[in-house]
């Protein structure tokens, strides 16, 4: 697993209305790719876009069935074993957008 990869869960998740969902890994590479670490931090993907600075819009070209939003305000810790279906990897541009959205959501200044 790597930062910027998109996965779909098979399990129905209570926080998602008991439906499977899409998640983007946002953990740093050392954590995401380390087989000894069982969890990663993920940003959930929602079908509804709200136009927030803390979200980025993605679509079919990014591996999603329809236009959706990666929401950085709702980061969640996921077991790697629940991220069962690899979908795609974000493009370099989408990764830059995600980094800006994460920075905004977490109020980080560099």
Where are the regions a protein language model picked out?
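C-terminal terminal-subdomain/extension
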Residues: 62-110
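Compact nucleic-acid interaction/catalytic patches
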Residues: 16-60
